[in-house]
Structures are given as C-alpha cells and as structure tokens.
C-alpha cells in the first residue's frame, strides 16, 4: 500500500488529461469528464490502480527482481533518475536506444566499453595520453555514460518495465512486449492502455504528478527489499522476534 492521498494527487494536478481533441477513446473508462476542453481523469480509479502497482513491484522486489525505470521526457527525467538510484534499480532517463532490450547482447558490449573507460579514467590513464586522444576518449565516455549509465549494473534483461508516458516511450514498450516482459505504465488520456499490464491513469506531463508515481513505486520496491531482509533474519535465528505494524497544471504545446 502506498502513502499517497487523493488530495496529494489533486494538488499535483494528476487529474488533468490532455485536450479533448487529442483523446484516445480506449481511455474513456478512466475519464471523469472535461473542463475547459481538458479531459479530467478519475482519480478514484487512479488511486487503487496505483496501489495495485505498488503491491506488484513490492512482491517483485522481495524476490530480488529487477525493474527498469524508463522516463526520457523532460517532466520525468529527474524523478526517474533520483528514485531509481534511491531504490537501487536500473533506469533510462536520456534516450531509449533501439534494441536496448531486444538486442541486449550488443548493448552489453557497449556497457563493457563504458566500464573499461571509467576504469581507465579512475586509474589516471587519460593523463598519460596526448591531449587529442584523451579528449576523444573523454567524449566517448560521456556519451556512453549519458545513454547507458543507468543500466550499467543491470546485469541482464529486467523482470519488468516501469514507464512514464507509454506513448512517448512506445519503442521501449514494444520491445518489452516482444520479450514478454511485464509493463507498468503511466497512461494519459491521449494514449492507449492496450498492452500495458499495470496501468496508472494519470497526468504524465506534470513534474509533480510524475514524481508522486515514481516515488510511490520506489518506496514500494524498498519495502519489498526490506521485507525480504526481515524474512531472512527471522528464519536464520529462532531467537529473533519480528513484529510489523500492520494547483492546476494546464497542458501546453498542443
């Protein structure tokens, strides 16, 4: 169960969808109505669905599963990076490279190269090179770090994807579907919930709203990891007793 309230979602503008002329009819069951030609998302459906997502990722994390956070649009980048790091999960916050999942063997070679360059820099080997060569390697390192730094330690394909804006990240969603990797997605009124295993109907353009979704998922992952740790401690020692207590943001640029 997440700690977010209906009031918090409202204050973050999570209920504001896109302009009515851009709507996707497949999202009709999640739409409460419209105001000033903006669709209003029914948060009474969003909140329990967000709870379903947090319960799901908590179970995954308890089983040491890897959940890849994906959010490359401006409204999502900072939250995706911050909260994925906080809960120890891989992330993509810059640009989704085609084949990042479906051609992972090739991507892994680039990750090896990234680690090699980082090790060279840490050992000060760049300082022993001529200026031009050191500059070229530095630029290569920066480029690889920007595109692959978040999945550097993923160690294989993820067990699930958590995506902010399934339309913007449609390539990532398509690759996951091809590999039968479950997809958790924030879906706004202009996109389709089809092929999304766990839907979070909500505003995907508000930074405050996006931060709430991502924070809730990260918190649930940490809870799952902690429950796994508690379970191991209690099973390892019969002497350990474990107790548990049970502003409106209008869309722009359309």
Curated annotation (Swiss-Prot):
The gene is rpsB. PANTHER family: 30S RIBOSOMAL PROTEIN S2 PROKARYOTIC AND ORGANELLAR, SMALL RIBOSOMAL SUBUNIT PROTEIN US2M. NCBIfam families: rpsB_bact. Transmembrane segments: none annotated. Belongs to the universal ribosomal protein uS2 family. This is Small ribosomal subunit protein uS2. HAMAP family: Ribosomal_uS2_B. InterPro entries: Ribosomal_uS2, Ribosomal_uS2_bac/mit/plastid, Ribosomal_uS2_CS, Ribosomal_uS2_flav_dom_sf. One of its GO terms (cellular component) is cytosolic small ribosomal subunit. GO terms for molecular function: structural constituent of ribosome. CDD domains: RPS2. GO terms for biological process: translation. Signal peptide: none annotated. It comes from the Bacteria. The lineage of its organism: Bacteria, Pseudomonadati, Pseudomonadota, Gammaproteobacteria, Legionellales. Keywords: Ribonucleoprotein, Ribosomal protein.
């Amino acid at each position: 169960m997440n700690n977010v309230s209906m009031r918090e979602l409202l204050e973050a503008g999570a209920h504001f969808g896109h302009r009515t002329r851009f709507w996707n009819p497949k999202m009709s069951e999640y739409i409460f109505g419209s105001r000033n030609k903006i669709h209003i998302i029914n948060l009474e459906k969003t909140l329990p669905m967000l709870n379903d997502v947090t319960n799901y990722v908590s179970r995954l994390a308890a089983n040491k599963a890897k959940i890849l956070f994906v959010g490359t649009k401006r409204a999502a980048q900072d939250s995706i990076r911050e909260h994925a790091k906080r809960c120890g999960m891989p992330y993509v916050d810059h640009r989704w490279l085609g084949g990042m999942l479906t051609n992972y063997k090739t991507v892994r070679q680039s990750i090896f190269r990234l680690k090699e360059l980082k090790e060279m820099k840490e050992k000060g080997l760049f300082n022993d090179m001529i200026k031009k060569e050191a500059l070229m390697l530095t630029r290569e390192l920066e480029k690889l770090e920007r595109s692959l730094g978040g999945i550097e330690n993923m160690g294989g394909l993820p067990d699930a994807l958590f995506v902010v804006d399934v339309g913007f990240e449609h390539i990532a969603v398509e690759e996951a579907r091809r590999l039968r990797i479950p997809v958790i997605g924030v879906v706004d009124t202009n996109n389709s919930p089809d092929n999304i295993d766990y839907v979070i109907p909500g505003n995907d353009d508000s930074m405050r709203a996006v931060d709430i979704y991502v924070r809730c998922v990260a918190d649930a992952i940490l809870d799952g990891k902690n429950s796994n740790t508690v379970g191991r401690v209690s099973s390892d020692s019969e002497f350990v007793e474990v107790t548990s207590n049970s502003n409106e943001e209008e869309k722009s640029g359309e």
